């Protein structure tokens, strides 16, 4: 009986923790203008807070598997929840943009460990016969988080106070730690092997300095010279890592996986696509609130339409892929997605609410098909023994791309406003940013068009072999 309870409750615990992380990743976007006023900053400068969270997620993902093997999955998962709760408290108590940015990075680190280690727990604790049902639990946060986050954040910001957004995580986190201690066994590997610390310092440090340096070019927190130096040092560290990874047998992030055609197209093409998609959750609430004068809750009601569009498309994705194949879908759908993103730049004060909602809905509908296609095909030609390491590389690139999207959007928005001579954001300042990030998603066609016509057939049609050209 106790084993049955543990087999049921372990996936529920992990799913709840993932839901907390998924909601938190989306909850602040509708609160950004109000937070900016509280910190005495321009709303665009809060891009650094969004970027720091994504960065915390990205740079720590590669070490999560090793930590779980070395210290035990339960111990790391429990610590991850604790770090996330501490980060939430720090966010709620922040009195400046600098402290809030650091707090969001801490949250990102906790979130980075929660998701992959949670999957490890499911794999080790749940019986194989129950594995599919357990994974279904884990799919719920990915679907509901993007919808619940903007709604919850908008409601709390409009009718209560934005700081209360982060207090929600505290009781949930404490309960999660208690349930983890009670129901999840602390499994570990007897011989985890060494961690590539040199690779971790070079890749994590390089990515952090490069992305944060770009985000700080507006001169709000540091001087432009300091931001430029950070960016250059980060780029140099990443370059050194590329040379280092070629000479090490098992580097932390094995760049040799890019030699696999489907992996290369999915990750590199997906990176361009995610630059566009990563910017939308940042830009959309700003244009709705600062440009069109909506409240945080009103913008949340519209922003969540994207998540509903994504949910609907997921029910059709398998059928679409079987009918047209990965290459065709990835190419045409990237174009549709880029157009849908750019269309958000057409919003002006007289735009009907129903039309805005429809465009945002389509802005979630087409990207959901793209993500499903990319995620399904990424590891199609990777040997099963290498999937774990390939996943680490793919996950890091994905997160960095999302953060880069926010940074690019913020830079374009700042330039446009300066050209227009606006002291505060106006609706007319946003269209160039939407067009630029929409073009980034559109440009992913240049990578995915190199795929063979039958790429991914093994997945959608059950073929044993895939021929690539």
Positions of PLM-derived features:
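Intrinsic disorder in cytosolic terminal tails and internal cytosolic loops
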Residues: 1-6, 189, 449-469
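12-transmembrane solute porter fold
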Residues: 7-23, 28-30, 43-44, 49-50, ...
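MFS transmembrane alpha-helix packing/gate-lining sites
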Residues: 24, 53-60, 110, 141-145, ...
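Extracellular/periplasmic helix-loop-helix junction of adjacent transmembrane segments
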Residues: 31-61, 97-101, 297-301
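Small-residue (Gly/Pro/Ala) motifs that create kinks and tight helix-helix packing interfaces
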Residues: 32, 145-157, 161, 210, ...
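Membrane-helix boundary and inter-helical linker elements of multi-pass secondary transporters
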Residues: 38-39, 44, 69-70, 92-95, ...
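Helix-loop-helix hairpins in multi-pass membrane proteins, especially solute transporters
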Residues: 61-198
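Hydrophobic transmembrane-helix bundles of small-molecule transporters
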Residues: 158-269, 294, 302, 437-438
